[in-house]
Amino acid sequence: MLFAPLQPYATHALQVDATHTLYVEESGNPDGIPVLFVHGGPGGGTEAWHRQFFDPQRYRIVLFDQRGCGRSTPHASLVDNTTWHLVDDMERIRVHLAIDAWAVFGGSWGSTLALTYAQTHPARVLGLVLRGIFLLRKAEIDWFYQQGSSWIFPDAWEAFEAAIPADERGDYVGAYYRRLTSDDPKVRLAAARAWSRWEGATSKLIPTADAAARFGESAFAEAFARIECHYF
């Protein structure tokens, strides 16, 4: 169940180092239980409906876009963009908002990052809510990008593999990474769209038109695909 749509009561542009500035927002009850929403991807960014997981009367809802994605800048940057940088960013956000401890809510890649943060800063975590758990293990990556999910979504897989020559298909992640970091913007964008559309087509058992449109949008796809492939 999702709660009714709501708007943030505060937004922040938090500079976390010489390169990156993060988009951070607060919604719900300023005096409520603090909860941090950790989005997926990596590179997925936050959306307005993510606020709706939480009762706005009870929770002080904090959303942020991780390095390089969403409304954070610079767009699609891979510079100093690692798990440990993101964990440090979460702490910087907590301190900036003067929160002593908060609940942490994450799904997919967000569950990986939430767990890592909780293990690193246990005294700052009131509790964890994890959904769609993904732990960035090689077996999970291989199943999704090499062989496994292709059997469930064969039509979408055809488009994903068509972007890569046959002699490079032994390592799709590596092949896509070379294209996503190419000096040629046309090569980068074509690879980004193919990578992103594959995820959009497979993120739900029954894909939706809204998801397909979002994952195919150029700016979203470039950040999402570059950052996700960089981590994988």
Report residues per predicted region.
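N-terminal cap/lid segment of alpha/beta-hydrolase-fold proteins
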Residues: 1-26, 228
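Conserved HGGG/HGGXW glycine-rich cap/lid loop of the alpha/beta-hydrolase fold
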Residues: 16-74
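Short glycine-enriched, charge-decorated loop/helix-capping segments at active-site entrances
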Residues: 75-81, 145-146
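Conserved acidic catalytic loop of the alpha/beta-hydrolase fold
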Residues: 84-102
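Conserved hydrolase catalytic core segment
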Residues: 100-139
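A catalytic-pocket lid/entrance helix-loop region that shapes and gates access to the active site
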Residues: 123-176, 231
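An accessory alpha-helical subdomain
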Residues: 165, 171-203, 212-213
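Alpha/beta-hydrolase fold catalytic core
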Residues: 193-232
